């Protein structure tokens, strides 16, 4: 904050000001990774539980029990991978009808009833980059897996320098990187692992990686949908936290 007060202290003051107590070491106890709870993505967030100070004598013991015993009971036995989450969705293939690298390339329409599984258009240049990078991972060559090689590739292909690397292929056999609200602008960092498809992930694929069921629809345009999905708390994580909080209420 501008006055130098750590965010954690402000959070503690905020809870205390309305009569609630939170765990004594938020950084140590409250950080949770959604991938531990069945969500196919690495997504670290703080889950802060507040208990009213006047409802029991030893709030800290209950808070410690919540983080160390109750919530961990709902962890999954194994982590869910990207391929397990989206691998059964129909392929969406690029329709390349031009050799102009700047031309916008469309994609085949998937034959499925699932909503929002539709690719956005990309330039031929980007399609070729996506295919090359996905094939680099799939083949095991791994020439473009570090920041420098990816930044150099961006400069070579786009003709501009970037302080950060702009490309990332989702690994089929691992959880995804964190789904973000500005995915509609940062699709280069969410490239589909299948080289044949040459694209970033669709809204439905992003929703599945957030653990939404396919019957969950999103109202709005594609940009609105990416934002809603990226800002959401993964439903599977929310369910686990809710069940754990329910146990705390039973104790109280």
Indicate where each model-derived feature is located:
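Class I S-adenosyl-L-methionine
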Residues: 1-154
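C-terminal target-recognition/interaction regions appended to catalytic cores
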Residues: 100-252
